[in-house]
Amino acid sequence: MAKSDVKGINLGMGTGRRKSSVARVYIREGKGDIKINNRDFDSYIQLENLKTIALSPLVLTNTLGKYDLYINIYGGGISGQAGAIRHGIARALFDLDEEYKMVLKSNGFLTRDSRKVERKKFGKKKARKSFQFSKR
């Protein structure tokens, strides 16, 4: 459940994961400031498609610009981090106000994407690719 700080402003928290990235998202009512690891959102994520992925829960719930987000993220690459931010924002919005649950769940934002890189097996070139086979 959402807590409130000293000034009585509602606070929400959500943890998002994708591949090997983990994002802790803190959300509160504000002007729409987004900080990732104490850096501005636009300087941390530069690719437009990753910005769209990361902010999609806010766009879907029409809350872009209504909340301040403070995100701590580590691990993985830029694509996994964008997915982890999306998952964390969705969970934080749900923690803040449960009326967003149906919209977020129907679009799959509350579900953790469990796909990870498959490990390489011995006797193979990659995880599934075999060495070239020669009959003679």
UniProtKB/Swiss-Prot annotation:
Task: Tell me the SUPFAM superfamilies matching this sequence.
Answer: Ribosomal protein S5 domain 2-like (SSF54211)
Does Protein transport count among this protein's keywords?
no
One MF annotation (Gene Ontology) recorded for this entry: structural constituent of ribosome
InterPro entries recorded for this chain?
Ribosomal_Su5_D2-typ_SF, Ribosomal_uS9, Ribosomal_uS9_bac/plastid, Ribosomal_uS9_CS, Ribsml_uS5_D2-typ_fold_subgr
PROSITE patterns listed in its UniProt record: RIBOSOMAL_S9
Q: Which UniProt keywords apply?
A: Ribonucleoprotein, Ribosomal protein
Respond yes or no to whether keyword Nucleotidyltransferase is given for this record.
no
Q: Tell me, which GO biological process terms does this entry list?
A: translation
Q: Which GO terms describe its cellular component?
A: cytoplasm; small ribosomal subunit
Q: Which family does it belong to?
A: Belongs to the universal ribosomal protein uS9 family.
HAMAP family from the xrefs? Ribosomal_uS9_B
Please give the name of this protein. Small ribosomal subunit protein uS9
The protein's organism comes out as Borrelia turicatae (strain 91E135)
Q: By which gene is this protein encoded? A: rpsI
